[in-house]
Amino acid sequence: CIDPIDGTKSYVQGIPLWGTLISLSKKNKIILGLVDIPVLDERYIGYGNIAYKIFKGRKTELKVKKNKTLSKATLNTTSPYLFEDKKDQRAFNNLQKNVKSTRLGGDCYSYCLLADGHVDIVVESGLNPWDIRALEPIIINAGGILKTWDNKNISNGGRIIACTNKKVFNKCRSILNKKNPSKNCLLY
């Protein structure tokens, strides 16, 4: 899968958080993921059992944060407007109430920040396979989790949760999949 410009709106607006995503699969298993953030001179690579970042020519191993508490977690999403379904909007808002802080606007870079230990959770909705496949080996090999909201493989895209660990992931899933999320707070 190739996504030549992930974060098209960022690219058009001159915001340097867009990137090129490339994944390689063998027998329906993603075996290589590469994210290039050219404006920042950063490249993220995951394959085999390793994940690393190359920044200005220097290679460093990627490791997710060790935080295991949802209330201390940082949450990222590209935009709350990508949650087109009202139930998903409410679910995201409920999750937002349970974390320390929320940041918007990261596109593919949010996932790279998670793999590099700067972010705890990334939640998105409506992703295509080319938006997410390259990120799987990077996040998993850095020690994180990348699944759909219903705990499935991300290969087909959809509603995605990336987390630093299973404990935070399960709490996120529980909140996002609650049958009747609070209806009193929409994101817009």
Predicted regions and their residues:
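DPxDG-like acidic metal-binding loop motif
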Residues: 1-52
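Short helix-to-loop capping/linker segments positioned immediately adjacent to catalytic or ligand/cofactor-binding
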Residues: 9, 61-64
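Active-site glycine-rich loop that binds ribose-phosphate moieties when present
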Residues: 22, 60-61
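A structural micro-motif at secondary-structure boundaries
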Residues: 54-58
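An extended, acidic
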Residues: 63-188
